[in-house]
Amino acid sequence: MKRITLGTSTLSVPNIALGCMRLAGKTQQEAATVLQTALDAGIDFFDHADIYGGGRSEEMFAAAARQAGITRDQVLLQSKCGIRPGFFDFSKAHIIASVEGSLKRLNTDYLDTLLLHRPDTLCEPDEVAAAFDALETSGKVRYFGVSNQHPLQVELLKSTVRQPLLTNQLQLSIMHTPMIDAGFNVNMTHAPSLHHDGMVLEYSRLQKMTIQAWSPFQYGFFDGVFVDNDKFPQLNATLQHIASEHGVSTTALAAAWILRHPASMQVIVGSMDPQRLQDIATASELRISREEWYEIYRAAGNKLP
């Protein structure tokens, strides 16, 4: 498993992480098997959020890890906070309470990383800074980052937050590429030229923030998986051809397509199927060619200027 450095820190992480949102729907034995499979494949980074399964996903992780004999020093734990029923909340009180809840559910004394989940337009940067300072000083959080945030929202936080913001977790897949499309269509007037995200890809590279790619196999906003989907015949034919050339599955190739980008991203995969997880892990060391990357991009329906 290839490892990268998270943002500007010295923290070494695998370039594939396990997203734990679906753990809540598994039995303890099933979850224990998934966690052990991930570790055996070199995936020791686990992504959580306080809202996943209403907190049940974090509880299941702790129970499954205990059953599998997995100790705290074997894993890197990330959680996210800021989403509440019907609104977003980056207040100091909520951030700290959320972390306290995650620590209890995960049965740990600290998180390796904490991300602010979705932008809160009522965010007061001073409150975020105070929360981060308290969590860092108490040893409850080692590193910090954001999720789904525009570069200017990151800059607003950085105006008061002392700690480096190491990551931005963003939706990215072969079938969801707005952060890439805009860069190809500078000085154009058609839809792909619109900067929906403030050139977050280039910003992240300049700031040395690690992009964590979520929903790497989805199209739309949780509309479904594009791999082996009859709705995308050209894309899947291309994936099957290139995957066969490399001796990997189309799913692994879809992850490798993201990892080929020189931004040195981390892919968050959510599979709870042990065999599929082992399969996806083969993407870690796979480096496709520039020509193959562009062929896949075009097969997804994208046109180059």
Predicted regions and their residues:
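Conserved beta-strand positions
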Residues: 18, 48, 79, 113-116, ...
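Active-site mouth loops of central-metabolism enzymes
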Residues: 19-29, 81-93
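Beta/alpha (TIM)-barrel catalytic core signal, keyed to glycine-rich beta->alpha loops juxtaposed to Asp/Glu
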Residues: 125-305
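Active-site groove signature of glycoside hydrolases
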Residues: 103-124
